[in-house]
Amino acid sequence: MKRMLTGLQPTGVITFGNYIGSIKKMVQNQDKYESYIFVADMHAITVPQDSKELRKNIRSLIALYLACGIDPDKNIIYIQSENEYHANVSWLLECNSYYGELSRMTQFKDKSLKHVNFTAGLLTYPVLMAADILIYDVDYVPVGKDQKQHLELARDIAGRFNKKYGETFKIPEPIISFDDNEFLIKDLQNPTLKMSKSADNKKGVILLLEDLKSIRKKIMSATTDSEMRVVYDPINKPGISNLIQIYASVTNKSYKEIEKEFDGKNYGEFKKCVADEVVKVIGDIQEKYNKIINSDEIDKVLDKGREITRKIAYKKYILMKEKIGLGR
């Protein structure tokens, strides 16, 4: 079975867009791949974090993973910082990376402009990401537009290391995630933009742990147009097209089926059906989350993941040390 790796940062805020574009995809893939799913807490500290909130968010994200249907018997679930070999391998890769290629990363350029005193971690973030991937010899990595450049760098670093020291790493291939196809969920108030937790207007963003009445209200207030035709046309009708995408994502119906279902019906009727289906899905997730969050299931899953990943990562780290000439 081919091996795949994916992870999310523990921001404390998971949107419905994150669920459809990332977590749901993990669930769909868990019978197709040997999946490594991690909480990227070391990546999170490239910007300031409150320590208590960070730890709480880590546990919350694991609980959400499980509540959304990620099966710990089919996936290896772990916390990045609980495997010290990620940092060790990252340093060895940093010494085979160049300042120029790191400083050209689009995310670094964007984020460094927003912070007067940014950390070195913001610059070397992509090398740690490369370590996360290469340490497990994964075959595939799901990526959206914002991370595609980082995966290309990981492939470059792996190829460079292999050429310099001999065959060490498998070169991973990208899987284009839902972020790049029709299931990119947009902001309910500004449907030309991706649904994002950082949006100024929170009325356009649905959160997985949000009050269900609030979610329903946001969907019923979503921006549409004056035509009153439920037709998928993202250029001319971005608002209603976004709602069609949302409805399709939770019902598994095609756009054509949805257009036929709501032919002759007004937007209010359509929005109510969208809200009903979304609330049903998120309500089920929340019910499971509330049972899991304070249970010992989380620690059992993480203990198992830590044990498995540390053994694999240790072997790769020792191999790298030997090839480089470190130690005795």
Q: Can you name each region flagged by the protein language model?
A:
Residues 18, 149, 155-328:
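Conserved nucleotide- and phosphate/pyrophosphate-binding catalytic cores
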Residues 50-51, 140-144, 168, 230:
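Short, polar/flexible loop-turn hinges at active-site or ligand-entry regions and domain interfaces
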Residues 1-2, 328:
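Short, Lys/Arg-enriched, disordered terminal segments
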Residues 107-161, 165, 187:
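Internal, conserved structured core segments that host functional sites
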Residues 76-79, 142, 227:
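Short catalytic-loop micro-motif centered on adjacent basic/acidic residues
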Residues 8-10, 41-43, 139-140, 199, ...:
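Short, histidine-centered active-site or binding-site loop motifs used for metal coordination
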Residues 99-103, 135-142, 248-258:
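Short helix-capping/linker segments at secondary-structure and domain boundaries
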Residues 2-131, 277, 282, 286, ...:
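N-terminal Rossmann-like or analogous alpha/beta NTP/dinucleotide-binding catalytic cores
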